């Protein structure tokens, strides 16, 4: 039985149990419902829910383990939930309809993609729990990220086909790149010193990804994902063919979703050679990895489950039923 079907009193008993230091949780938003699923990657079971967030989209976790942040598309707010009780404690009004979100390394700022023209990233101070700034960018923003070194905020726009890079300290744009197709999810490769080397870019109508050199601000490579074997039917996705990427913590593997193929693929870094892939559920929309880099959790939007994939064997090991139309997910480490 799915955890979401268990009587609330039993969920309450589970939530009352203290979390061990270093507990990992997969936070899975369900965009067609009002619930966010909390997954334990040890048991691969749903162990709790955040309820009452209309059309929940992006998620982030406070580094101190106290709060979850979820963008609420229905009400155009950033909702804050207590990690222990999973209750929403505050809703912060935004300047427009939000999409994905990101949190600064110190947890003091949440950056919210505003997915309406002319385009902006809202800045939320997590101490005052208020919007303190809006950063104008070119085009409605689909996704926003903080680079692994914490120095930059990077947004991408489908409409304007533009990546905007923002200095995290000044919260001002420092460079941008307009490409030939709409900007979908991003991921990052690092230099040996931890600084950002490349941006991996998924693009509208491309079953693959581009590589942008962070230093030169130029596209240097474009890679197409494998074609399906003969007899396998493509999944019709309306031009959004590849959506969701992640890089393992050791920086050696790029995991790439293909909505068109209902599969995920694994590429070595830095040579970007295909190592393998596996079929998952329909319309894999996002992917997050465990901190040890051993397991991928793939949100399958058209199947209403999360595919769990062992990265070493590149095989799906189980499926976790969640809510309706699961999309964005993150990995939270609760100290």
Model regions and ranges:
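Bacterial N-terminal signal peptides that target proteins for export
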Residues: 1-12
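Leucine-biased recognition of intrinsically disordered, low-complexity hydrophobic segments
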Residues: 11-19
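Predominantly soluble domains enriched in secretory-pathway, periplasmic, or organellar proteins
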Residues: 18-335
């Amino acid at each position: 039985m799915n955890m979401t079907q268990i009587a609330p009193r039993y969920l309450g008993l589970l939530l009352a149990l203290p979390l061990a230091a270093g507990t990992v949780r997969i936070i899975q938003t369900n965009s067609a419902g009002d619930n966010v699923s909390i997954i334990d990657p040890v048991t691969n079971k749903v162990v709790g829910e955040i309820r009452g967030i209309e059309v929940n989209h992006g998620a982030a976790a406070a580094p101190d383990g106290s709060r979850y942040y979820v963008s609420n598309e229905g009400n155009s707010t950033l909702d804050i939930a207590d990690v222990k009780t999973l209750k929403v404690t505050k809703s912060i009004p935004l300047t427009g309809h939000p999409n994905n979100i990101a949190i600064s390394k110190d947890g003091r700022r949440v950056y919210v993609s505003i997915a309406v023209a002319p385009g902006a990233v809202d800045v939320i101070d997590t101490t005052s729990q208020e919007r303190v700034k809006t950063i104008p960018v070119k085009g409605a923003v689909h996704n926003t990220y903080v680079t692994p070194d914490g120095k930059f905020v990077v947004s991408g726009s489908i409409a304007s086909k533009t990546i905007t890079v923002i200095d995290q300290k000044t919260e001002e744009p420092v460079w941008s790149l307009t490409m030939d197709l709409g900007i979908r999810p991003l991921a990052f490769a690092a230099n040996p010193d931890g600084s950002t080397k490349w941006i991996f870019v998924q693009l509208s109508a491309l079953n693959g990804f581009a590589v942008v050199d962070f230093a030169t601000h130029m596209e240097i490579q474009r890679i197409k994902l494998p074609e399906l074997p003969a007899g396998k039917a493509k999944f019709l996705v309306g031009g959004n063919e590849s959506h969701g990427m992640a890089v393992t913590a050791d920086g050696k593997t790029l995991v790439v979703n293909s909505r068109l193929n209902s599969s995920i693929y694994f590429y070595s870094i830095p040579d970007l050679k295909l190592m393998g892939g596996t079929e998952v559920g329909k319309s894999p929309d996002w992917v997050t990895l465990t901190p040890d880099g051993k397991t991928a959790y793939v949100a399958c939007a058209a199947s209403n489950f999360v595919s769990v994939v062992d990265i070493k064997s590149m095989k799906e090991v189980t499926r976790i039923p969640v809510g309706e139309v699961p999309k964005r997910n993150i990995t939270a480490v609760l100290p």
